[in-house]
């Protein structure tokens, strides 16, 4: 599934996309809308992003999942920042009508072949918090998650899914069966 075309084909299926999110987030998700290869233009039309897979849940959270095989070409961390910012643009109205409280919680997930942080974790989850009071979260509703197919340190179901994405073969010894 690390192949872009195969990944997008699978994510078109709402149930498959929902399963991927449920495994990564370790919580039940009810998806209402799914889009693949969705293009979001910057308001001035100068820059755009093409989301591999996007979804909205029944609790109005929005999710973007990006498969990033080559992490050497670009800074995936900064790319996640840009993606998250542009995902908010279509939701906001210009001028005095802007009401930021209507921005939905947003989860941006990058799945990479390599561990871009080099700390040997299958998943890294980031939310913004105060440097002086680390227990104080900003509460802006943004979560950025970086999963990788290199490390096997993480929840068994997550590692199994990532290993399956890395080598999509039922004979892969690093995957476990997820019974529904």
What are the roles of these predicted feature ranges?
Residues 1-179:
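Elongated, amphipathic alpha-helical interaction scaffolds
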